Amino acid sequence: MNKVSVGGVELLAVENQQTLVAYLLNNGVLLTGKLIAINAEKIMIYQEDNEMKRLLEEAEYKYADGISVVCTIRSKYPKYSKIERIAGADLWERLMAELGECCLPVFLVGSSEDTLQATAMKLQEWQVKVVGTQNGYFAKEQEEEIIQRIKASGAKFISVAMGSPKQEKFMQKAQQLYPDALYMGVGGTYDVFVGKVKRAPKCWQNLGLEWLFRILHQPTRWKRQLRLMKYAYFYLTKRL
């Protein structure tokens, strides 16, 4: 698949969610590697943090989650003017539904134990084959043991809800020890999936204002959004 570059980060030039899902499922043979959502904040961290830069460069599949990234691609690459934002939470749900139909085993990592179990139960109602779970509260010394559990489970898809950059670091290590699976970083997706966190209404999502909805409902996130201002400056000065 073709790629585009935004701020030095290479992303899949995929037009919409349906196309990306079909690409990852590869006619029933799930691709292996790391799947990471890219937004403006992550691109700015890529510019500032050498470790994050390395993690993102080594991730096989990166897609445009943030509307600002989508706007940059449309402006920078006229041939991709129809590219759409692919929300990570929506992509994950679609993949879960498809994996359930294909009977491919799934392992869930991250979040609190109660949210994790609620997620697993709901997925099982969707006929998803959940072969293991691990909450996000574990020490670095336990990582190898957890990864061996994942490997022993035979999981082909591992979703990791630990927030960035913890989930990227974990996926990197897990892939080194167990490369025969697709790893996806999903942040707070489990909380949204089971109804613990309210997601922006569809009209906000369609307008590309989901980030603003999050700030209004979680004011502690405002500092993270300062990077959006920096991104906007880079965009206006054509440094992306």
Predicted regions and their residues:
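N-terminal nucleotide/polyanion-binding subdomain common to many enzyme families
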Residues: M1-I86
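Short glycine-rich anion-binding loops that position phosphate/pyrophosphate groups of nucleotides
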Residues: A40-I43, M162-Q167, T189
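Conserved acidic residues
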Residues: E60, V106, V131, K156, ...
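A transmembrane-helix-recognition feature enriched in membrane-embedded lipid enzymes
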Residues: V70-C71, R199-L240
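Conserved beta-alpha
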Residues: V70-R149, S153
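Short Gly/Thr/Asp-enriched flexible loops that form oxyanion-binding sites at enzyme active sites
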Residues: A120, E168-L177
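Short, flexible loop segments at boundaries between secondary-structure elements
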Residues: N135-E141, P179-H217
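Proline-aspartate-enriched helix->loop->beta-strand connector
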Residues: I150, G154-S159, S164
